[in-house]
């Protein structure tokens, strides 16, 4: 039996005294050790659930000169040139992509349709989905799945009113299994000659604004252990194509979110939730990836989430502003190094 007592003082002046009593078995402690989580960390997590999480105090809104940098054309060109010069000197730049996010929330409306007591589209979303289904990047793959599993094409299934069979083949394991895959492995954008996953769009971006003068592009994806092999397989299948297209060489690495950053799950009474007798842990949010980020050896790292991508026709502003931001970072880095030299 472990007892934990603490005193909290929050920025808003609220002070909370609380006592926490949590019972952990030797097997629980072994689980904590396996994950690399100290028992006191677990106790602190439980205490936070009990006391609540205070809102941050907002000091002011961001504005030009107060968190927002406004550049004229001359300044913009200066930072663009600074970035291009930095890349020519072959500094190591890494594109860091959190890619463990599941796609299940993207399909919540389709899951609702599957479980609904009606069989044809009723909501605006459902009607729009089926009216536009041929425009989705996954359409051809889904059509093949329907032909294989149902013996009929998407068009035939819709014409016969079997809408749910189409959705089932999209979301479930018998078909494309999109309901269980991470966003990075989904076909996101449709092109005239091919369709791209979100991961492939990041390969494209990396070549456009993070390639060194000798064509080296470093991209690091953080993924779940469950889907690591799938990501590696997709890279093995697609990397050479994008290297030829953009005249670059990719150095792609992966890491998994560290289990030591997991958070214990609680029940309605904020007590440890157990599954099959063991405390259940859930992965921490993207903030937990700070440790993965810290492990990256690079001078400048661009961080961008896996689903924050656009098709090629919309990429120009993204590439331009990434280069500008890179130039701003180089300017700040130079200034910091100058101060360090002065202090020495």
What are these regions (language model features)?
Residues 24, 29-32, 51-54, 58-344:
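Domain-scale recognition of functional cores that engage charged ligands
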